[in-house]
């Protein structure tokens, strides 16, 4: 980070913010055992809001699921983007 970026408060990109949020969610879930994934609907709404800035999509165009098998967790996000 440069001094100017620090002083002027350069805004983070939405992708890096989303990545940080996902990392926090995953770390929280792993630390807390196998609690229910009650954050998935909120995550889906936020994804729709971010992607809608660039492409016209609806809430039904995104599917978010979390699968657990033993000590492995898979967060799956499926996004249907309409053809141009």
Curated annotation (Swiss-Prot):
An example Gene Ontology biological process: cell division
Per the record, the domain of life is Bacteria
Q: Where are the transmembrane segments?
A: none
Would the keyword Cell cycle turn up in this protein's UniProt record?
Answer: yes
Q: Does the keyword Cell cycle apply?
A: yes
Keywords assigned by UniProt?
A: Cell cycle, Cell division
Q: Which Pfam families match?
A: MinE
User: Do you know which InterPro entries this protein is assigned to?
Assistant: MinE, MinE_sf
NCBIfam families the UniProt entry points to = minE, PRK00296.1, PRK13989.1
What function does this protein fulfil? Prevents the cell division inhibition by proteins MinC and MinD at internal division sites while permitting inhibition at polar sites. This ensures cell division at the proper site by restricting the formation of a division septum at the midpoint of the long axis of the cell.
What family does this chain come from, according to its entry? Belongs to the MinE family.
Its recorded name reads Cell division topological specificity factor
Q: Which organism is it from?
A: Paraburkholderia phytofirmans (strain DSM 17436 / LMG 22146 / PsJN) (Burkholderia phytofirmans)
């Amino acid at each position: 980070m440069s001094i100017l970026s620090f002083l002027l408060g350069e805004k983070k990109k939405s992708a890096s913010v989303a990545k940080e949020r996902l990392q926090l969610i995953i770390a929280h879930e792993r630390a807390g055992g196998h609690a229910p994934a009650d954050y998935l609907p909120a995550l889906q709404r936020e994804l729709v809001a971010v992607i809608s800035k660039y492409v016209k999509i609806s809430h039904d165009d995104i599917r978010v699921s979390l699968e657990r098998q033993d000590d492995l967790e898979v967060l799956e996000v499926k996004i249907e983007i309409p053809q141009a």
